[in-house]
Amino acid sequence: MNELRKLSITQMHDGLKKKSFSAVELVEAHISAVENEKLNAFITKTPEIAMKAAKAADEHFSRQKDDLISPLMGVPVGIKDLFCTKGIKTTACSKMLENFVPTYESTVSDLLLKSGAAMLGKLNMDEFAMGSANTNSYFGPVENVWIRKSDGEKVVPGGSSGGSAASVAGFLCAGALGSDTGGSVRQPAAYCGVVGIKPTYGRCSRFGMIAFASSLDQAGVITRSVSDSALMLEAICGYDTKDSISSEKPVPKLSSFINGDVKGKCIGIPKEYRMDGISEEIVHNWERVASYLKENGAEVVDITLPHTKYAIPVYYLICSAETSSNLARYDGVRYGLRVDADTLEEMYSLTRAEGFGKEVKRRILIGAYALSSGHYNEYYEKAQCIRALIRNDFIKAFEKIDYILVPSAPTEAFGLNEKPDPLIMCINDVFTVPASLAGLPAISVPVGLSNEGLPLALQVIGNYYDEAGILNVASVIEQNCGRIIRPLA
Protein backbone atom coordinates (compact mmCIF):
# COMPACT_ATOMS: atom_id res chain seq x y z
CA MET A 1 0.00 0.00 0.00
CA ASN A 2 2.91 2.34 0.71
CA GLU A 3 4.05 1.95 -2.91
CA LEU A 4 0.84 3.63 -4.07
CA ARG A 5 1.59 6.67 -1.91
CA LYS A 6 4.95 7.17 -3.63
CA LEU A 7 3.35 7.70 -7.03
CA SER A 8 3.07 11.07 -8.74
CA ILE A 9 -0.34 12.31 -9.85
CA THR A 10 0.52 11.37 -13.44
CA GLN A 11 1.53 7.86 -12.34
CA MET A 12 -1.66 7.53 -10.30
CA HIS A 13 -3.72 8.53 -13.32
CA ASP A 14 -1.91 6.09 -15.62
CA GLY A 15 -2.27 3.27 -13.10
CA LEU A 16 -6.00 3.90 -12.73
CA LYS A 17 -6.48 3.95 -16.51
CA LYS A 18 -4.58 0.67 -16.90
CA LYS A 19 -6.43 -0.79 -13.90
CA SER A 20 -3.12 -1.60 -12.20
CA PHE A 21 -4.93 -0.65 -9.00
CA SER A 22 -8.30 0.82 -8.11
CA ALA A 23 -9.08 4.31 -6.85
CA VAL A 24 -10.46 2.70 -3.69
CA GLU A 25 -7.11 0.99 -3.07
CA LEU A 26 -5.26 4.23 -3.77
CA VAL A 27 -7.43 6.27 -1.44
CA GLU A 28 -7.47 3.61 1.29
CA ALA A 29 -3.66 3.66 1.35
CA HIS A 30 -3.71 7.40 1.95
CA ILE A 31 -6.56 7.28 4.48
CA SER A 32 -4.56 4.77 6.52
CA ALA A 33 -1.54 7.08 6.43
CA VAL A 34 -3.61 10.11 7.44
CA GLU A 35 -5.19 8.23 10.35
CA ASN A 36 -1.72 7.38 11.68
CA GLU A 37 0.11 10.61 10.81
CA LYS A 38 2.25 12.29 13.47
CA LEU A 39 2.96 15.58 11.71
CA ASN A 40 -0.28 17.24 12.89
CA ALA A 41 -0.89 18.15 9.25
CA PHE A 42 -4.62 17.26 9.15
CA ILE A 43 -6.99 18.86 11.62
CA THR A 44 -10.25 17.58 10.08
CA LYS A 45 -10.33 14.19 8.37
CA THR A 46 -12.96 13.26 5.78
CA PRO A 47 -12.37 9.59 4.85
CA GLU A 48 -16.01 9.05 3.90
CA ILE A 49 -15.90 11.87 1.35
CA ALA A 50 -12.63 10.55 -0.08
CA MET A 51 -14.04 7.03 -0.40
CA LYS A 52 -17.17 8.32 -2.14
CA ALA A 53 -14.99 10.06 -4.72
CA ALA A 54 -12.84 6.92 -5.10
CA LYS A 55 -15.86 4.71 -5.77
CA ALA A 56 -17.18 7.22 -8.32
CA ALA A 57 -13.77 7.20 -10.02
CA ASP A 58 -13.67 3.40 -10.17
CA GLU A 59 -17.14 3.35 -11.68
CA HIS A 60 -16.00 5.82 -14.31
CA PHE A 61 -12.83 3.86 -15.13
CA SER A 62 -14.86 0.64 -15.40
CA ARG A 63 -16.63 2.08 -18.44
CA GLN A 64 -13.27 1.99 -20.24
CA LYS A 65 -13.77 5.40 -21.77
CA ASP A 66 -11.18 8.14 -22.21
CA ASP A 67 -13.58 11.00 -21.49
CA LEU A 68 -12.15 11.57 -18.03
CA ILE A 69 -13.23 14.70 -16.22
CA SER A 70 -9.57 15.36 -15.42
CA PRO A 71 -6.30 13.60 -14.58
CA LEU A 72 -7.15 14.27 -10.92
CA MET A 73 -10.03 11.79 -10.80
CA GLY A 74 -9.57 9.53 -7.80
CA VAL A 75 -6.38 11.31 -6.72
CA PRO A 76 -6.09 11.90 -2.92
CA VAL A 77 -5.71 15.59 -2.00
CA GLY A 78 -5.82 17.83 1.06
CA ILE A 79 -7.33 21.31 1.38
CA LYS A 80 -5.91 24.09 3.52
CA ASP A 81 -8.38 25.01 6.26
CA LEU A 82 -8.67 28.54 4.88
CA PHE A 83 -11.01 27.41 2.09
CA CYS A 84 -14.68 27.08 2.97
CA THR A 85 -15.98 23.56 2.45
CA LYS A 86 -19.75 23.18 2.55
CA GLY A 87 -20.90 21.17 5.55
CA ILE A 88 -17.31 20.58 6.72
CA LYS A 89 -15.74 22.52 9.56
CA THR A 90 -13.53 25.39 8.34
CA THR A 91 -11.60 27.11 11.12
CA ALA A 92 -8.67 29.09 9.64
CA CYS A 93 -6.95 27.36 12.60
CA SER A 94 -8.31 29.98 14.98
CA LYS A 95 -10.31 29.63 18.17
CA MET A 96 -12.52 32.34 16.69
CA LEU A 97 -13.82 29.87 14.07
CA GLU A 98 -13.25 26.63 15.98
CA ASN A 99 -16.78 25.35 15.31
CA PHE A 100 -17.64 27.21 12.09
CA VAL A 101 -19.31 25.05 9.41
CA PRO A 102 -19.79 26.91 6.10
CA THR A 103 -23.02 26.68 4.13
CA TYR A 104 -21.21 27.12 0.80
CA GLU A 105 -18.10 25.89 -1.02
CA SER A 106 -15.12 28.00 -2.05
CA THR A 107 -14.72 28.21 -5.81
CA VAL A 108 -11.27 26.61 -5.95
CA SER A 109 -12.17 23.67 -3.69
CA ASP A 110 -15.38 23.22 -5.68
CA LEU A 111 -13.41 23.06 -8.94
CA LEU A 112 -10.94 20.62 -7.41
CA LEU A 113 -13.68 18.30 -6.16
CA LYS A 114 -15.60 18.52 -9.44
CA SER A 115 -12.43 17.35 -11.18
CA GLY A 116 -12.89 14.08 -9.29
CA ALA A 117 -10.17 14.54 -6.66
CA ALA A 118 -10.68 12.69 -3.37
CA MET A 119 -10.57 15.07 -0.41
CA LEU A 120 -8.88 13.45 2.58
CA GLY A 121 -9.51 16.40 4.90
CA LYS A 122 -8.61 19.93 5.95
CA LEU A 123 -5.02 20.92 6.57
CA ASN A 124 -3.36 22.75 9.45
CA MET A 125 -2.02 26.28 8.92
CA ASP A 126 -0.95 29.41 10.75
CA GLU A 127 -3.96 31.18 12.26
CA PHE A 128 -5.75 33.18 9.54
CA ALA A 129 -2.69 32.45 7.33
CA MET A 130 -0.47 34.76 9.41
CA GLY A 131 2.94 33.22 9.95
CA SER A 132 6.00 31.67 8.35
CA ALA A 133 6.47 28.50 10.41
CA ASN A 134 3.02 27.00 11.11
CA THR A 135 3.60 27.54 14.82
CA ASN A 136 0.67 29.97 15.19
CA SER A 137 -2.13 27.42 14.78
CA TYR A 138 -4.79 27.06 17.49
CA PHE A 139 -4.50 23.31 16.90
CA GLY A 140 -0.76 23.16 17.54
CA PRO A 141 2.32 23.31 15.31
CA VAL A 142 2.95 21.17 12.25
CA GLU A 143 6.15 19.13 12.04
CA ASN A 144 8.30 18.94 8.94
CA VAL A 145 9.12 15.44 7.67
CA TRP A 146 12.79 16.42 7.44
CA ILE A 147 15.07 16.18 10.49
CA ARG A 148 18.19 18.28 11.14
CA LYS A 149 21.19 15.99 10.77
CA SER A 150 23.58 17.47 13.36
CA ASP A 151 21.30 17.19 16.40
CA GLY A 152 18.30 15.16 15.25
CA GLU A 153 16.01 18.13 15.91
CA LYS A 154 12.62 18.51 14.27
CA VAL A 155 12.27 21.58 12.05
CA VAL A 156 9.36 23.79 11.03
CA PRO A 157 7.53 23.15 7.74
CA GLY A 158 7.23 26.86 6.96
CA GLY A 159 3.98 28.74 6.74
CA SER A 160 1.33 29.59 6.54
CA SER A 161 0.52 26.54 4.37
CA GLY A 162 2.67 24.28 6.56
CA GLY A 163 0.08 21.52 6.76
CA SER A 164 -0.25 21.50 2.97
CA ALA A 165 3.52 21.25 2.39
CA ALA A 166 4.15 18.70 5.16
CA SER A 167 1.28 16.45 4.04
CA VAL A 168 2.58 16.33 0.47
CA ALA A 169 6.22 15.83 1.53
CA GLY A 170 5.09 13.11 3.96
CA PHE A 171 3.15 11.20 1.27
CA LEU A 172 -0.14 11.74 3.10
CA CYS A 173 -1.69 13.13 -0.09
CA ALA A 174 -0.58 13.59 -3.70
CA GLY A 175 -1.25 17.31 -3.77
CA ALA A 176 -2.72 20.06 -1.62
CA LEU A 177 -4.45 23.39 -1.90
CA GLY A 178 -2.69 26.28 -0.21
CA SER A 179 -2.95 30.05 -0.16
CA ASP A 180 -0.18 32.56 -0.80
CA THR A 181 -0.36 36.14 0.49
CA GLY A 182 3.34 36.92 0.88
CA GLY A 183 4.90 33.52 0.23
CA SER A 184 2.67 31.09 2.12
CA VAL A 185 2.79 28.44 -0.61
CA ARG A 186 6.33 28.96 -1.87
CA GLN A 187 8.19 29.22 1.45
CA PRO A 188 6.75 26.04 3.07
CA ALA A 189 7.26 24.20 -0.22
CA ALA A 190 10.92 25.26 -0.03
CA TYR A 191 11.29 24.09 3.59
CA CYS A 192 9.64 20.73 2.87
CA GLY A 193 11.41 19.95 -0.41
CA VAL A 194 8.31 20.03 -2.61
CA VAL A 195 6.98 22.23 -5.43
CA GLY A 196 4.71 25.20 -4.69
CA ILE A 197 3.22 27.62 -7.20
CA LYS A 198 1.39 30.91 -6.75
CA PRO A 199 -0.37 32.00 -9.95
CA THR A 200 -0.95 35.56 -11.10
CA TYR A 201 -3.20 37.54 -8.75
CA GLY A 202 -6.73 37.03 -10.10
CA ARG A 203 -6.05 33.69 -11.85
CA CYS A 204 -7.82 31.76 -9.08
CA SER A 205 -11.01 32.94 -7.44
CA ARG A 206 -10.86 34.16 -3.85
CA PHE A 207 -14.55 33.38 -3.29
CA GLY A 208 -14.90 31.26 -0.17
CA MET A 209 -11.27 31.76 0.86
CA ILE A 210 -11.25 33.33 4.33
CA ALA A 211 -9.78 36.80 3.85
CA PHE A 212 -6.43 37.85 5.28
CA ALA A 213 -5.17 40.63 2.96
CA SER A 214 -7.52 40.87 0.01
CA SER A 215 -5.20 42.70 -2.39
CA LEU A 216 -2.58 39.96 -1.95
CA ASP A 217 -4.44 36.70 -1.21
CA GLN A 218 -4.21 34.07 -3.94
CA ALA A 219 -4.83 30.32 -4.00
CA GLY A 220 -1.99 28.02 -5.00
CA VAL A 221 -1.02 24.35 -5.07
CA ILE A 222 1.71 22.17 -3.57
CA THR A 223 2.80 18.86 -5.13
CA ARG A 224 5.88 16.64 -5.35
CA SER A 225 6.69 17.48 -8.98
CA VAL A 226 6.39 20.36 -11.42
CA SER A 227 4.16 18.40 -13.81
CA ASP A 228 1.80 17.56 -10.93
CA SER A 229 1.58 21.25 -10.03
CA ALA A 230 0.61 22.04 -13.62
CA LEU A 231 -2.21 19.47 -13.50
CA MET A 232 -3.60 20.75 -10.19
CA LEU A 233 -3.32 24.41 -11.14
CA GLU A 234 -5.19 23.79 -14.41
CA ALA A 235 -8.09 22.46 -12.37
CA ILE A 236 -8.54 25.49 -10.09
CA CYS A 237 -7.83 28.46 -12.38
CA GLY A 238 -10.49 30.38 -14.28
CA TYR A 239 -12.89 33.29 -14.28
CA ASP A 240 -15.45 33.53 -11.48
CA THR A 241 -18.27 36.07 -11.39
CA LYS A 242 -18.25 35.83 -7.59
CA ASP A 243 -14.80 37.46 -7.36
CA SER A 244 -14.50 41.06 -8.54
CA ILE A 245 -10.80 40.76 -9.40
CA SER A 246 -11.10 37.40 -11.17
CA SER A 247 -9.35 37.43 -14.55
CA GLU A 248 -11.27 36.63 -17.72
CA LYS A 249 -8.02 35.77 -19.49
CA PRO A 250 -8.25 32.21 -20.89
CA VAL A 251 -6.32 29.54 -18.99
CA PRO A 252 -4.13 27.42 -21.29
CA LYS A 253 -3.52 23.71 -20.77
CA LEU A 254 -0.49 24.35 -18.58
CA SER A 255 0.87 20.80 -18.64
CA SER A 256 1.23 20.91 -22.44
CA PHE A 257 3.79 23.74 -22.21
CA ILE A 258 6.31 21.72 -20.20
CA ASN A 259 8.83 20.78 -22.88
CA GLY A 260 12.17 21.20 -21.09
CA ASP A 261 13.36 23.80 -23.58
CA VAL A 262 14.73 27.16 -22.39
CA LYS A 263 16.76 27.99 -25.50
CA GLY A 264 16.58 31.69 -26.28
CA LYS A 265 14.93 32.59 -22.98
CA CYS A 266 16.43 35.45 -21.00
CA ILE A 267 16.65 34.93 -17.24
CA GLY A 268 17.40 37.80 -14.88
CA ILE A 269 19.36 37.65 -11.62
CA PRO A 270 18.50 40.72 -9.50
CA LYS A 271 21.52 42.15 -7.71
CA GLU A 272 19.32 43.39 -4.84
CA TYR A 273 18.58 39.78 -3.82
CA ARG A 274 22.26 39.17 -3.03
CA MET A 275 21.80 40.41 0.52
CA ASP A 276 23.24 39.71 3.93
CA GLY A 277 21.88 36.69 5.75
CA ILE A 278 21.58 34.31 2.79
CA SER A 279 22.98 30.84 3.38
CA GLU A 280 26.17 30.17 1.40
CA GLU A 281 24.66 26.84 0.33
CA ILE A 282 21.68 28.62 -1.20
CA VAL A 283 23.96 31.08 -3.03
CA HIS A 284 26.00 28.14 -4.36
CA ASN A 285 22.87 26.40 -5.70
CA TRP A 286 21.58 29.69 -7.13
CA GLU A 287 24.80 30.14 -9.12
CA ARG A 288 24.93 26.46 -10.10
CA VAL A 289 21.37 26.41 -11.46
CA ALA A 290 21.91 29.71 -13.31
CA SER A 291 24.95 28.16 -15.01
CA TYR A 292 22.95 25.04 -15.90
CA LEU A 293 20.21 27.12 -17.52
CA LYS A 294 22.88 29.00 -19.47
CA GLU A 295 24.40 25.70 -20.65
CA ASN A 296 20.95 24.71 -21.91
CA GLY A 297 20.61 27.74 -24.14
CA ALA A 298 19.17 30.40 -21.86
CA GLU A 299 20.72 33.83 -21.57
CA VAL A 300 21.41 34.77 -17.94
CA VAL A 301 21.81 38.47 -17.19
CA ASP A 302 22.07 40.69 -14.14
CA ILE A 303 19.10 42.99 -13.55
CA THR A 304 18.12 45.59 -10.99
CA LEU A 305 14.92 45.82 -8.95
CA PRO A 306 15.83 48.98 -7.02
CA HIS A 307 12.86 49.16 -4.65
CA THR A 308 13.25 45.58 -3.35
CA LYS A 309 14.66 46.83 -0.04
CA TYR A 310 11.30 48.39 0.81
CA ALA A 311 9.26 45.25 0.10
CA ILE A 312 9.11 43.83 3.65
CA PRO A 313 7.99 47.03 5.45
CA VAL A 314 5.55 47.84 2.63
CA TYR A 315 4.10 44.33 2.71
CA TYR A 316 3.61 44.27 6.47
CA LEU A 317 1.98 47.69 6.50
CA ILE A 318 -0.46 46.80 3.71
CA CYS A 319 -1.31 43.29 4.88
CA SER A 320 -1.73 44.44 8.49
CA ALA A 321 -4.03 47.26 7.41
CA GLU A 322 -6.15 44.86 5.36
CA THR A 323 -6.11 42.37 8.25
CA SER A 324 -7.46 45.02 10.60
CA SER A 325 -10.30 45.72 8.18
CA ASN A 326 -11.10 42.11 7.20
CA LEU A 327 -11.04 40.72 10.73
CA ALA A 328 -13.34 43.44 12.08
CA ARG A 329 -16.23 41.14 11.10
CA TYR A 330 -15.35 38.72 13.92
CA ASP A 331 -17.22 40.40 16.76
CA GLY A 332 -19.25 37.58 18.32
CA VAL A 333 -22.53 38.78 16.81
CA ARG A 334 -23.09 36.88 13.56
CA TYR A 335 -20.88 33.78 13.66
CA GLY A 336 -17.81 32.37 15.33
CA LEU A 337 -16.87 32.57 18.99
CA ARG A 338 -18.99 34.64 21.37
CA VAL A 339 -17.96 35.44 24.94
CA ASP A 340 -20.99 36.59 26.92
CA ALA A 341 -20.71 39.89 28.78
CA ASP A 342 -22.90 42.55 30.41
CA THR A 343 -22.57 45.08 27.58
CA LEU A 344 -22.18 44.90 23.81
CA GLU A 345 -18.83 46.68 23.89
CA GLU A 346 -17.52 44.30 26.54
CA MET A 347 -18.73 41.32 24.51
CA TYR A 348 -16.82 42.62 21.46
CA SER A 349 -13.67 43.09 23.50
CA LEU A 350 -13.76 39.75 25.34
CA THR A 351 -14.65 37.79 22.20
CA ARG A 352 -11.77 39.21 20.18
CA ALA A 353 -9.32 38.93 23.08
CA GLU A 354 -10.10 35.25 23.55
CA GLY A 355 -10.70 34.33 19.91
CA PHE A 356 -7.52 35.69 18.31
CA GLY A 357 -3.95 34.52 18.89
CA LYS A 358 -0.93 36.76 19.55
CA GLU A 359 0.25 37.13 15.94
CA VAL A 360 -3.24 38.00 14.69
CA LYS A 361 -3.67 40.59 17.46
CA ARG A 362 -0.26 42.06 16.65
CA ARG A 363 -1.19 42.59 13.00
CA ILE A 364 -4.64 43.97 13.81
CA LEU A 365 -3.06 46.56 16.10
CA ILE A 366 -0.43 47.54 13.53
CA GLY A 367 -3.10 47.79 10.85
CA ALA A 368 -5.47 49.85 12.97
CA TYR A 369 -2.64 52.27 13.71
CA ALA A 370 -1.64 52.54 10.04
CA LEU A 371 -5.24 53.23 9.01
CA SER A 372 -5.98 55.76 11.74
CA SER A 373 -6.79 59.27 10.56
CA GLY A 374 -3.60 60.75 11.98
CA HIS A 375 -1.29 58.22 10.32
CA TYR A 376 -3.08 57.06 7.13
CA ASN A 377 -1.11 59.30 4.76
CA GLU A 378 2.15 58.72 6.57
CA TYR A 379 1.97 54.91 6.51
CA TYR A 380 -0.74 53.18 4.46
CA GLU A 381 -0.93 55.64 1.57
CA LYS A 382 2.87 55.87 1.33
CA ALA A 383 3.15 52.05 1.40
CA GLN A 384 0.74 51.79 -1.52
CA CYS A 385 2.81 54.33 -3.48
CA ILE A 386 5.99 52.33 -2.91
CA ARG A 387 4.13 49.14 -3.84
CA ALA A 388 3.44 50.74 -7.23
CA LEU A 389 7.18 51.43 -7.60
CA ILE A 390 7.98 47.78 -6.80
CA ARG A 391 5.44 46.66 -9.40
CA ASN A 392 6.92 49.05 -11.95
CA ASP A 393 10.41 47.65 -11.28
CA PHE A 394 9.17 44.24 -12.39
CA ILE A 395 7.27 45.61 -15.39
CA LYS A 396 10.39 47.42 -16.57
CA ALA A 397 12.55 44.33 -16.04
CA PHE A 398 10.18 42.11 -18.02
CA GLU A 399 10.52 44.40 -21.03
CA LYS A 400 13.99 42.89 -21.51
CA ILE A 401 13.86 39.48 -19.83
CA ASP A 402 11.50 36.49 -19.68
CA TYR A 403 12.00 35.14 -16.15
CA ILE A 404 13.67 35.95 -12.84
CA LEU A 405 15.61 33.39 -10.79
CA VAL A 406 15.96 33.99 -7.03
CA PRO A 407 16.06 31.94 -3.80
CA SER A 408 12.74 30.94 -2.22
CA ALA A 409 14.01 31.55 1.32
CA PRO A 410 17.27 32.93 2.74
CA THR A 411 18.00 29.83 4.84
CA GLU A 412 16.98 26.23 5.41
CA ALA A 413 14.17 25.46 7.88
CA PHE A 414 14.90 26.32 11.51
CA GLY A 415 14.21 24.19 14.59
CA LEU A 416 10.63 23.54 15.65
CA ASN A 417 11.43 24.49 19.24
CA GLU A 418 13.42 27.58 18.39
CA LYS A 419 11.59 30.85 19.04
CA PRO A 420 12.76 33.45 16.53
CA ASP A 421 11.96 37.10 17.07
CA PRO A 422 8.76 38.09 15.16
CA LEU A 423 10.86 40.52 13.11
CA ILE A 424 13.20 37.69 12.04
CA MET A 425 10.14 35.67 11.05
CA CYS A 426 9.01 38.55 8.83
CA ILE A 427 12.39 38.65 7.09
CA ASN A 428 12.01 34.97 6.12
CA ASP A 429 9.60 36.23 3.45
CA VAL A 430 12.12 38.64 1.93
CA PHE A 431 12.38 36.73 -1.37
CA THR A 432 8.70 35.86 -1.79
CA VAL A 433 7.01 39.14 -0.84
CA PRO A 434 8.07 41.25 -3.88
CA ALA A 435 6.26 38.99 -6.39
CA SER A 436 3.18 39.05 -4.16
CA LEU A 437 3.15 42.85 -4.01
CA ALA A 438 3.39 42.95 -7.81
CA GLY A 439 0.79 40.18 -8.29
CA LEU A 440 3.17 38.08 -10.39
CA PRO A 441 3.19 34.28 -10.76
CA ALA A 442 6.04 32.45 -9.02
CA ILE A 443 7.04 28.85 -8.37
CA SER A 444 9.37 27.33 -5.78
CA VAL A 445 11.30 24.23 -6.85
CA PRO A 446 13.73 22.20 -4.68
CA VAL A 447 17.38 22.20 -5.79
CA GLY A 448 19.19 20.10 -3.20
CA LEU A 449 19.92 19.43 0.46
CA SER A 450 22.01 21.46 2.89
CA ASN A 451 24.86 20.01 4.94
CA GLU A 452 22.21 19.53 7.65
CA GLY A 453 20.22 17.33 5.28
CA LEU A 454 17.44 19.92 4.88
CA PRO A 455 15.83 21.05 1.59
CA LEU A 456 16.98 24.14 -0.30
CA ALA A 457 14.94 25.78 -3.06
CA LEU A 458 14.94 28.41 -5.78
CA GLN A 459 12.08 30.44 -7.16
CA VAL A 460 11.18 31.31 -10.75
CA ILE A 461 9.15 34.50 -11.19
CA GLY A 462 7.38 35.18 -14.48
CA ASN A 463 5.46 37.94 -16.18
CA TYR A 464 1.72 38.31 -15.67
CA TYR A 465 -0.27 35.20 -16.68
CA ASP A 466 2.84 33.26 -17.72
CA GLU A 467 2.26 30.33 -15.37
CA ALA A 468 3.04 27.99 -18.28
CA GLY A 469 6.46 29.58 -18.73
CA ILE A 470 7.55 29.39 -15.11
CA LEU A 471 6.38 25.78 -14.92
CA ASN A 472 8.55 24.96 -17.92
CA VAL A 473 11.65 26.67 -16.48
CA ALA A 474 11.02 24.94 -13.15
CA SER A 475 10.82 21.59 -14.96
CA VAL A 476 14.28 22.20 -16.45
CA ILE A 477 15.63 22.94 -12.96
CA GLU A 478 13.91 19.80 -11.68
CA GLN A 479 15.58 17.73 -14.42
CA ASN A 480 18.97 19.00 -13.30
CA CYS A 481 18.48 18.77 -9.54
CA GLY A 482 16.15 15.80 -9.30
CA ARG A 483 13.25 15.55 -6.89
CA ILE A 484 14.14 16.01 -3.24
CA ILE A 485 12.09 13.19 -1.75
CA ARG A 486 12.44 11.94 1.82
CA PRO A 487 12.24 8.12 1.91
CA LEU A 488 8.80 6.85 2.86
CA ALA A 489 8.81 5.31 6.33
From Swiss-Prot:
Catalytic activity: L-glutamyl-tRNA(Gln) + L-glutamine + ATP + H2O = L-glutaminyl-tRNA(Gln) + L-glutamate + ADP + phosphate + H(+)
GO terms of molecular function: ATP binding; glutaminyl-tRNA synthase (glutamine-hydrolyzing) activity
Keywords on record: ATP-binding, Ligase, Nucleotide-binding, Protein biosynthesis
Database matches in InterPro entries: Amidase (IPR000120), Amidase_CS (IPR020556), Amidase_dom (IPR023631), AS_sf (IPR036928), GatA (IPR004412)
SUPFAM superfamilies the UniProt entry points to: Amidase signature (AS) enzymes
EC numbers, comma separated: 6.3.5.7
Gene Ontology process terms (BP): translation
Bilayer-crossing regions: none
EC top class named in words: ligase
Record flagged with keyword Nucleus: no
GO cellular component, one term: glutamyl-tRNA(Gln) amidotransferase complex
Keyword check for Ligase: yes
Entry annotation: catalytic residues: 80, 160, 184
Homology family: Belongs to the amidase family. GatA subfamily.
Subunit note: Heterotrimer of A, B and C subunits.
Role summary: Allows the formation of correctly charged Gln-tRNA(Gln) through the transamidation of misacylated Glu-tRNA(Gln) in organisms which lack glutaminyl-tRNA synthetase. The reaction takes place in the presence of glutamine and ATP through an activated gamma-phospho-Glu-tRNA(Gln).
HAMAP family for the chain: GatA
UniProt name for this protein: Glutamyl-tRNA(Gln) amidotransferase subunit A
